[in-house]
């Protein structure tokens, strides 16, 4: 058996040598093939960058132009990178949504179903959209090429070469982040859906026009889309029509390509995005909507253009403690505040108050509201500057609660700022057809609204020379004007009521134009105002017809609605315009008698001042039954509150630092309307040292915030024990209207000297849930009878946790009051937690002593634990709590 030849020696044999040589010679050509293109591209970039320098020298331009061009290029590049970065971050969020939510659970830009329990997540719908997205893309591509492209070419002779060279809608499809369903008990024939739409697409759309190319390589669109299924039917297809619109302007960002990259230049990018947003808003944002009939033969006119559901009147009164923005060299300055008030596409701006951190506007704005719930009132405050206005804070109020409560007068804390409060009075005006609701006032406020449904016109003249009144026939026309006048007019309409003017769209080249648009006007005087209408030609810039219609002619019509064809003046004999005019009166309707007040300001029902007077000497405490005689004389607590409220109509409603009321100078019976609840006696003929207690129940007539008055000098109370019985009785009597008082009885010492042994003091808290802001509001009024830590008293402050949350970021803390055992804080804190979750939590309130670092003084002064599940948070509550070491009440 012959041995096998080894394989190793054959390796260096002849056949392998040429191969090695070939391998050793290969890197040379490859390296040269890679370096040459890179070298060419580098030289091209250098020449491209140096070209502006050469042109500047050749043209004799200054170096300033070079610096300006470089600055603009850097700015464009920065904006471009930022837009690409945001697009990549959005793609990353779509691909890793679960990890992102778990990591950034407490972020601000999370889907709505995380923050609001009534918004449902619909992953099943997203899976269906993903599955059918390729087929939808093919359908949209065919529609664009077959219908949209020919229409664009027909618009102008310069667009005849317009072509969509690429239509690719990408793999990323629209997503529904959450769905909220609204059901109206008053109208059971419709279903309303709010869809949180998010489209972060990788689409690529390219167009070409005369060898000029441009396009889009990415789109971001986010907004709330409302879908209304109305009316519901008893037979197939069970739904009459589908109405779609955005509640607010959607957020839009577009990544341009080709020559359209110029739209990303500084100053132009914001303008281009805003123009596209306005284009979408003109068709799909309230009050504009798209209605698609599902059942054949169904009249969808009222669905396409419905009447407003109401009008909200916003009284922009004042603001306090706004942030300082006009700082110079780090020194504190002032601000020049103004406010922007908006609802949907309706915007108003207040005047500017210069150099004032506590401005007073006293301005009134009126807005029409079309969808409740859905539309919100937005108020943004800015500091006016010459370059760019600084942001001072914002506020967003749900109009659904305002509609229920009719009138809301309250101070609101501003969001997204360090400090600042805004005082608003909101009035909900209902639309009525009753002739008795027609009022005339001289205050400049609206008394009615007029809704004009502009349908169409017929037999319009081609030009003013077609009038048959003989006025223009004698005039001669030039050849150019004759050629223009021979075509049908491109007409539009101008409608004016008072000082407000609207312009319709232009219908090109038609004697019988169809507009089908709606316009709404505020009317100050129905008897004096009229609707002025002009039909104008867009090309000849002349009037084709005029109509002046007094609004008082609508009053005899049924349901204050007039629909007919109107003859145009200064037009052809048979030139008519078809309209439907609807008039509605405005009035603030009162709440039903006996219904509980459950609005956003359920605390405010006054103010109700109850004055208690005591003297140092010569006054004997009345028996307990006499002290409470007037209080308990009525069996109906609501009637007591009503009677007490009537007696203070002439008292100022301001709640900031109220002054004590003057005392009577002589003996006599006390008036029961005002001071029947004193429960104290007065000694005639002696000088009194009054101590006033304000039981402030803020309400619709109270413009001020929830605030306690300053403590006054404390007299001696030899009859302090009966007072302890009087104050709780007053709280219980007023619990029907609102159990949440601003009980500022800080001047009463309810504990005798010996009874304080073993007690740590008391703290007064006012707690309620504000439905408008979806937050729990805690007002720390003050403390009394605290334990001294030094010979000068203590330096107390209050710390609050909303258990079980104990993070440092969620802690609320008042300011420190120096050297006092009865501090008055009057500080408000808000916890933004849904109502359903608040009822499962509790408040941990601790009073502490501020001490320097390393000091051995006492830190804890007392603690209170409040179980919120046992409280009525909508009405609210206000009371004194005894401080204990562990927060639990003493047995």
UniProtKB/Swiss-Prot annotation:
Q: Which ranges of this chain reside in the Cytoplasmic compartment per its record?
A: 1-32, 76-891
Return the Pfam families for the record. C2, SMP_LBD
Keyword 4Fe-4S among UniProt keywords? no
Q: Which GO terms describe its cellular component?
A: cytoplasmic side of plasma membrane; endoplasmic reticulum membrane; endoplasmic reticulum-plasma membrane contact site
| Origin: domain of life | Eukaryota
Q: List the Lumenal topological domains.
A: 54
Which keywords annotate this record?
Answer: Calcium, Cell membrane, Endoplasmic reticulum, Lipid transport, Lipid-binding, Membrane, Metal-binding, Repeat, Transmembrane, Transmembrane helix, Transport
Q: Molecular function (GO) terms listed?
A: lipid binding; metal ion binding
> Which residues are involved in binding Ca(2+) 3?
385, 387, 389
Q: Where is this region: Disordered?
A: 1-30, 652-711
User: Which residue stretches does the UniProt record annotate as biased composition, category Basic and acidic residues?
Assistant: 17-28
All copies of the SMP-LTD domain together span 118-295
What SMART domains does UniProt report for this protein, alphabetically?
A: C2
What GO biological process terms are annotated to this protein in UniProt?
endoplasmic reticulum-plasma membrane tethering; lipid transport
Which intervals of the chain are annotated as region Required for phosphatidylinositol 4,5-bisphosphate-dependent location at the cell membrane?
A: 806-813
**Membrane topology qualifier:** Peripheral membrane protein; Multi-pass membrane protein
Entry binding sites for Ca(2+) 2 = 326, 336, 383-385
Where is this chain compositionally biased, Pro residues type?
659-670
| Compartments reported by the entry | Cell membrane; Endoplasmic reticulum membrane
Q: Which PANTHER family match?
A: EXTENDED SYNAPTOTAGMIN-3, EXTENDED SYNAPTOTAGMIN-LIKE PROTEIN 2, ISOFORM C
**In its UniProt entry, what is this protein called?**
Extended synaptotagmin-3
Native organism is Mus musculus (Mouse)
Name the gene.
Esyt3
């Amino acid at each position: 058996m012959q041995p096998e030849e080894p394989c190793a020696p054959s390796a260096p044999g002849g056949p392998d040598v040429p191969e090695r040589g070939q391998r050793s010679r290969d890197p040379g050509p490859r390296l040269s093939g890679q370096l040459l293109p890179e070298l060419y591209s580098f030289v091209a970039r250098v020449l491209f960058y140096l070209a502006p320098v050469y042109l500047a020298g050749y043209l004799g331009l200054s170096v300033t132009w070079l610096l300006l061009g470089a600055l603009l290029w850097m700015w464009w590049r920065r904006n471009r990178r930022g837009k690409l970065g945001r697009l990549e971050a959005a793609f990353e969020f779509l691909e890793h949504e679960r990890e992102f939510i778990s990591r950034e659970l407490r972020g601000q830009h999370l889907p709505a179903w995380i923050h609001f329990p009534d918004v449902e997540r619909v992953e099943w719908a997203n899976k269906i959209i993903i599955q059918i997205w390729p087929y939808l893309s093919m359908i949209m591509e065919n529609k664009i090429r077959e219908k949209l492209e020919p229409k664009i070419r027909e618009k102008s002779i310069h667009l005849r070469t317009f072509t969509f060279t690429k239509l690719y809608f990408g793999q990323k499809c629209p997503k529904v982040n959450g769905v909220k369903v609204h059901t109206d008990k008053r109208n059971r024939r419709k279903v309303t859906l709010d869809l949180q739409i998010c489209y972060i697409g990788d689409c690529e759309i390219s167009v070409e026009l005369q060898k000029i190319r441009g396009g889009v390589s990415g789109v971001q669109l986010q907004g709330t889309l409302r879908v209304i299924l109305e009316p519901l039917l008893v037979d197939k297809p069970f739904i009459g029509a589908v109405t779609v619109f955005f509640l607010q302007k959607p957020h839009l960002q577009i990544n341009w390509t080709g020559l359209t990259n110029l739209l990303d230049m500084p100053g132009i990018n914001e303008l281009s995005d805003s123009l596209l947003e306005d284009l979408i808003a003109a068709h799909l944002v309230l009050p504009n909507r798209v209605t698609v009939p599902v059942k054949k033969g169904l009249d969808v006119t009222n669905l396409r253009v419905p009447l407003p559901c109401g009008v909200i009147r916003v009284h922009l009164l004042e603001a306090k403690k706004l942030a300082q923005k006009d700082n110079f060299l780090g020194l504190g300055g002032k601000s020049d505040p103004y406010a922007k008030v908006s609802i949907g596409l309706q915007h108003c701006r207040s005047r500017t108050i210069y150099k004032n951190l506590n401005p007073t506007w006293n301005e009134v704005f009126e807005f029409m509201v079309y969808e409740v719930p859905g539309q919100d009132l937005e108020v943004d405050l800015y500091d006016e500057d010459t370059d760019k206005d600084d942001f001072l804070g914002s506020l967003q109020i749900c109009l659904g609660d305002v509609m229920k409560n009719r009138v809301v007068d309250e101070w609101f804390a501003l969001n997204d700022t360090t400090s600042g409060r805004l005082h608003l009075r909101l009035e909900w005006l209902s639309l009525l057809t009753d002739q008795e609701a027609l009022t005339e006032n001289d205050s400049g406020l609206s008394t009615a609204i007029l809704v004009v449904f502009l349908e169409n016109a017929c037999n319009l003249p081609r030009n003013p020379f077609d009038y048959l009144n003989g006025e223009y026939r004698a005039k001669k026309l030039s050849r150019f004007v004759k050629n223009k006048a021979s075509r049908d007019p491109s007409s539009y309409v101008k409608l004016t009521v008072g000082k407000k003017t609207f312009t319709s769209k232009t219908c090109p080249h038609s004697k019988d134009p169809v507009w089908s648009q709606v316009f709404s006007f505020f009317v100050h005087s129905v008897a004096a105002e009229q609707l002025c209408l002009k039909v104008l030609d867009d090309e000849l810039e002349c009037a084709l017809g005029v109509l002046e219609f007094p609004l008082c002619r609508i009053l005899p019509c049924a349901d204050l609605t007039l629909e007919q064809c109107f003859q145009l003046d200064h037009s052809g004999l048979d030139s008519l315009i078809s309209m439907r005019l609807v008039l509605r009166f405005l009035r603030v309707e009162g709440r039903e008698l006996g219904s509980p007040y459950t609005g956003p300001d359920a605390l405010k029902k006054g103010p109700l001042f109850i004055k208690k007077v005591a003297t140092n000497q010569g006054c004997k405490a009345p028996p307990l039954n006499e002290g409470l005689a007037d209080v308990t004389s009525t069996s109906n607590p609501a009637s007591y509150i009503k009677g007490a409220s009537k007696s203070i109509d002439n008292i100022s409603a301001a709640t900031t630092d109220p002054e004590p009321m003057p005392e009577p100078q002589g003996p006599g019976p006390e008036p029961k309307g005002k001071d029947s609840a004193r429960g104290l006696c007065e000694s005639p003929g002696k000088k009194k040292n009054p101590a006033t207690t304000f039981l402030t129940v803020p309400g619709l007539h109270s413009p001020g915030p929830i605030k306690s008055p300053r403590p006054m000098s404390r007299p001696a109370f030899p009859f302090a024990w009966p007072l302890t019985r009087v104050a709780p009785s007053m709280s219980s009597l007023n619990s029907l209207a609102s159990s949440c008082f601003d009980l500022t009885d800080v001047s009463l010492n309810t504990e005798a000297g010996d009874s304080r042994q073993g007690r740590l003091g008391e703290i007064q808290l006012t707690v309620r849930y504000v439905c408008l802001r979806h937050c729990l509001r805690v007002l720390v009024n003050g403390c009394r009878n605290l334990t001294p830590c030094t010979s000068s008293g203590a330096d107390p402050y209050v710390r609050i946790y909303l258990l079980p949350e104990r993070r440092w970021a969620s802690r609320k803390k008042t300011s420190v009051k120096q050297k006092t055992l009865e501090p008055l804080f009057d500080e408000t804190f808000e916890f933004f937690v849904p109502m359903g979750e608040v009822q499962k939590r509790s408040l941990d309130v601790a009073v502490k002593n501020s001490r320097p670092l390393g000091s051995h003084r006492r830190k804890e002064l007392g603690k209170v634990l409040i179980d919120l599940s046992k409280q009525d948070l909508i009405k609210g509550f206000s009371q004194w709590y005894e401080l204990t070491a562990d927060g639990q009440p003493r047995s």
